A protein has these predicted regions:
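Short, acidic Ser/Thr/Gly-rich low-complexity loop/linker segments typical of extracellular
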Residues: 52-63
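C-terminal beta-signal and adjacent terminal beta-strands/loops
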Residues: 708-741, 755-760, 767-835
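Transmembrane beta-barrel wall of Gram-negative outer-membrane proteins
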Residues: 244-267, 281-320, 342-367, 406-410
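Gram-negative outer-membrane beta-barrel transporters
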Residues: 473-478, 602-717
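Short strand-turn segments of transmembrane beta-barrel domains in outer membranes
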Residues: 193-195, 203-213, 222-252, 263-265, ...
Length: 835
């Protein structure tokens, strides 16, 4: 402990010396010089601060960081070949600002709104739409570029399991995606390829992987903030057709420039293209989906603005394994599951009305009325598994967010929100009788591994939160402490989340060296009804994580940047399926028996907050930004080393434990005796690397490449089978159930096996045809160019017994096998028109 205190004291002393050795009141403005007549940034423009006689130069987009000794009035002299131009500005504190070098005369009654919120540098990675819209391997989806950022592990696969990302070791379901600060249920459609947001609506994407700001919530993983276009100068549109979907986009200003409307949408037909190719087994109907986004903005004046949003997405997927009556799995890939039925549906609608009031440059208040309607449906019929469930967790909320510039050094963000939750969950709920069973058998009729229970839950609850963040900047030193509190009324439980970010910038080191650190407590409560009093646990708490991290960012030249950051996350109170959690007396979960038997003893709560885990690692990002309007190359190299461990803390009966306990004794032991073992999380990947390259060859062609490398995920090895005790009653096919080690002292127990490493190369070639009305973009995208047979764990064929050839490595999506057995890379061909 003394050593820790000594190191901490030394660290504080170093920070103190660094802080007081630099100018206290220096101010840095992030400026973009923009020519409104040409609607382009002033690239490579030399700017002199007249008072200090210092020179600066903009990049290819007109961006530049300019330093001032203190707050005050300054003159910027723009040095052009046609002669100098002077622009006077008022400097009060560090901020981001747009400077118009030449203004286009606004239409009568037109209003120009400027400004952008300054964001933290710690644990945040920003990508611009221009850099990612044509990235290979993303199938034209800008959101898929998140997979290449440091700290992010892609969820390799195809289908619903591939529509999440792992951020610094967190469960892929624990992230929050926000569209202009509005919730969306899921970011990617069930095909695992396309996002629910149209590309042309995206302005920037920010990934907060560490201790995110207090205005965000409900994530123990990462927060992905999608900022959409905030201005439309002229009528424009886009139309794109590919092998599996069609997208459209249109935007136009109205009311003499006072407002604008932007609309985007997507329709998927993968089931009608790839699904009709004969490359898939009979009975599989690939995902169908659609989405739409509407944004309407109107400025009444410089002080008042209203915005209306409506976001929708709908997905469904189904499998109906044919019952051919043939007991030959070599001819029918789904014979083991013949007669089985499975379907899943996802949808959401987010409708919002937002009013922004800006009475002065020092204060802004935003009120948002939100109606959020997420729906999930599933229907399964397979052996002993018979269930159909519909879940809806709608809420109506009012949110307030304000920003107050108290002084030139102090800004305060604060806000509150109240939601009225209305949940509806009915049907038949399916759960594992033993959630620690790694290989449940759907045809086990002697002692079924699955349990079904009727579900009919309706109710309401209040939810409220409040937050505040103080942004203090004294010269090159920044400190942002914040705190947030969330409370769910139905569980009478809340979560307090303090957090802070600290940074210091050395502007004289190349083009700027910033050292930063961050830490804090974050919380999340799943959008489910696991807290209901009839079949769930009404005492569930928020899932929590404590995040800490630190590193540095170094800029050199106008376009290069290197960023290195280390982190550690500690997860606790994770909600898990718990067959031993119970109350002495509770309502009978079967409502049909309420008249005859309303109360039952030892009523199972089914869920608890016993899950724990932790992750640690470091990230490296080397980046070269693009130069708009130039043919220079751009790209980045990212690398992440990490480890993630998880423990459900659910009691297990191991091999060799033959002592006979009564049910009550077993329940008491399970409550107080934790004998589960911590092991690597199933989504852990030690090494993740990405190399991204883009080059605009000339006005007609652009070439892009992407190489990805990932360590294989850990998995538990199959050590045998159950002898084929059960069979599928639909066709008599014997079902060989895999068997895993249940002895924690053997090498085969737990997630100890890894397969071959994953890597692939993707390329994309774009051809542009320019016309007076716009342009057409033809593109060819090839995934897995060198036909790497990547695997993800192993696959056990239940139609055959355990042997040297069963199980085999599980192939991942990335190649196509033609009927003649020829293997080709997966590819996408499409056309996009912009007008």
């Amino acid at each position: 402990m003394a050593s820790v205190k000594f190191k901490l004291n030394n660290y504080l002393i170093v920070l103190f010396l660094l802080f007081f050795s630099q100018p206290m009141f220096a101010v840095t403005l992030k400026l973009r010089f923009y020519n409104a007549k040409t609607e382009t940034g002033e690239k490579n423009l030399t700017v002199m601060v007249f008072e200090t006689k210092k020179f600066f130069q903009t990049d290819g987009e007109g961006n530049v960081n300019i330093e001032f000794p203190n707050a005050g009035e300054y003159t910027l002299r723009l040095l052009r070949e046609t002669g100098p131009t002077d622009i006077k500005i008022s400097v009060s504190g560090d901020e981001t600002r747009t400077v118009y070098t030449e203004r286009k005369a606004p239409p009568k009654g037109g209003i120009t709104v400027e400004g952008e919120r300054e964001k933290t540098v710690a644990a945040r990675t920003k990508v611009r739409y221009e850099e990612i819209k044509r990235m290979p391997g993303t199938f034209g989806e800008a959101l898929r570029a998140l997979e290449t950022l440091p700290g992010v592990i892609p969820n390799i696969g195809f289908g619903g399991g591939a529509n999440g990302i792992i951020v610094r070791g967190a469960d892929p379901q624990s992230n929050t995606f926000l569209y202009d600060d509005l919730p969306i249920l899921y970011a990617f459609h069930l095909d695992g390829l396309t996002s629910v947001i149209h590309n042309d609506l995206i302005k920037t994407i920010d990934l907060y992987s560490g201790a995110y700001p207090a205005n965000f919530n409900n994530a123990t993983g990462g927060v992905i903030e999608i900022e959409t276009v905030d201005a439309v100068q002229k009528t424009k549109g886009a139309f794109q057709v590919s092998l599996w979907n069609t997208t459209a986009y249109a935007a136009t200003p109205f009311a003499n420039g006072k407002g604008y409307v932007a609309v985007g949408g997507k329709y998927g037909y993968l089931d009608r293209t790839l699904g009709q190719s004969g490359l898939l087994p009979d009975g599989i109907r690939l995902p169908r989906y659609n989405d739409s986004q509407v944004k309407f903005v109107y400025n009444f004046s410089q002080e008042h603005q209203i915005a209306f949003y409506n976001l929708t997405a709908q997905d469904n997927f189904a499998i109906a394994a044919p019952n051919n009556g043939a007991n030959d799995p070599t001819k029918d890939e789904l014979s083991t599951f013949a007669g089985g039925r499975f379907s899943v549906g996802l949808s959401f609608r987010t409708t919002a009305l937002r009013h922004t009031w800006t009475p002065s440059e020092k204060f802004q208040n935003r009120l948002t009325l939100i109606n959020y309607d997420p729906i999930t449906e599933n229907n399964i019929s397979l052996g002993s598994i018979q269930g159909k469930q519909f879940t809806r967790a709608l809420y109506v909320g009012l949110r307030q967010d304000a920003t107050w510039t108290a002084t030139s050094q102090i800004k305060v963000d604060f806000g509150t929100e109240y939601r009225k939750l209305s949940f509806n969950d009915y049907g038949t709920e399916i759960q594992l009788r033993d959630p620690t069973n790694p290989s449940p058998n759907p045809y086990n009729t002697t002692n079924p591994d699955f349990v079904s229970r009727p579900l009919s839950v309706r109710g309401t609850s209040g939810y409220y939160n409040g937050y505040t963040t103080i942004k203090a900047k004294f010269g090159n030193f920044a400190f942002e402490p914040g705190v947030r509190y969330d409370h769910l009324e139905i569980t009478r439980n809340g979560a307090l989340g303090p957090r802070a970010t600290i940074s210091y910038t050395f502007p004289e080191v190349l083009n700027g060296l910033t050292i930063f650190g961050n830490g804090g407590d974050m919380a999340r409560f799943p959008q489910t009804t696991v807290f209901n009093r009839e079949t769930g646990n009404p005492n569930l708490e928020f899932e929590k994580v404590r995040k800490t991290g630190g590193g540095f960012s170094l800029k050199f030249g106008q376009v290069y940047e290197v960023k290195i950051e280390a982190f550690k996350n500690q997860f606790r109170d994770t909600i898990v399926n718990d067959p031993f959690a119970s109350v002495p007396i509770g309502l009978n979960p079967d409502k049909s028996q309420w008249l005859s038997n309303p109360l039952v003893s030892n009523r199972s709560l089914n869920y608890s907050n016993k899950g724990t885990g932790w992750s640690h690692g470091y990230e490296v990002l080397l980046r070269k930004n693009s130069k708009q309007g130039s043919r220079d190359w751009f790209g980045w190299v990212s690398y992440t080393w990490s480890q993630t461990f998880y423990n459900s803390n659910i009691y297990r009966v191991y091999d060799g434990d033959t002592f006979q306990y009564s049910a009550v004794e077993r329940q008491v032991i399970a409550e107080y005796y934790n004998n589960s073992k911590e092991q690597l999380a199933t989504w852990d990947r030690t090494h993740v690397a990405n190399v991204i390259y883009g080059w605009r060859i000339n006005e007609d062609y652009q070439l892009g490449g992407r190489w990805s490398y990932l360590t294989s995920v850990p998995y538990q090895r199959v050590i045998g089978d159950d002898g084929g005790q059960f069979s599928n009653p639909a066709n008599g096919q014997t079902f060989w159930n895999a068997r895993y080690s249940n002895n924690p002292y053997t090498a085969e127990f737990g997630n100890t096996k890894r397969g071959a490493d994953y890597h692939r190369l993707d390329i994309r070639l774009d051809k542009f045809e320019n016309y007076s009305w716009g342009y057409i973009n033809w593109y060819l995208e090839i995934v897995n160019v060198y036909l790497r047979k990547n695997t993800n764990g192993e696959s056990f064929d239940n139609s055959r017994p355990f042997s040297g050839t069963n199980p085999v490595p599980s192939q991942t999506f990335g190649t196509l096998e033609l009927p003649n057995r020829t293997v080709i890379p997966f590819f996408n061909i499409g056309m996009e028109a912009h007008f």
